[in-house]
Amino acid sequence: LEKKERIIGITSLRLDSPGLAVGTAKGVIKRVNPEVLSSKESWEFINLAPGDEVVGAVELANEDLHLVFITDDAQLLHYPASAVRPQGRAGSGVAGIKCSGQARVIWFGAVDPEDDAVVVTVSGGVDSLLSSETGSVKVSRFSEFPAKGRATGGVRCHRFLKGEGALMLGWAGAYPAIAATDSGAPIDLPAPTGKRDGSGAPAPQPIVAVASRHLAHPGPGGETPSAAASTDLLSGGVSDDQESLGQPELL
């Protein structure tokens, strides 16, 4: 990997797949048509604006999945994948979520609205680090969050307590979810009884990642892909450094 590069997802590159869905820190969404360049080992799949970076990439099983954004100012937006027209790899994407002020997207993925899905949010101070502050954690049913139109602001998904000012982590996916510390030790999460815009409860330890215990959604042919979608991978949000990580590539 190049300096400041990190892996954010895995795809099968199946030509019969609905393709990748990609979300960026500044709220851009892009669906990428499946394409394999046999003459190259890697290639770019989205043109990023200065200061932007990809925070999530997921291979879609079908267009019934909902694309989900979670921002650091506790807004959540989701809508069907069919609301976004696929583009070729040279495209720059379209507005996915309207971020207010200096807010940034900390998580992007895809969720089956028919699943027993949940939303996990962890709040803390504005300058808090995932690995050092426990923060407040909340688990809510995904069904609590109404779908909204693309490029809107979404709905509030977490109420901050005194001393809190941002989400340190956000995640949505199939229930049950599991959390982990920076050493990989599992952390029990509360039951999914949190109100849509309620506050969280003190986390027992700093949570740096959340994932589903379920496998990825079946692929276009009905089989489960060998590579999990981003909704099923441990995810700790955007990088600590908010500078652009360069143009993302498929390898």
Kindly give the residue locations of the regions a language model identified.
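Short, structured "edge-of-domain" segments at secondary-structure transitions
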Residues: 1-251
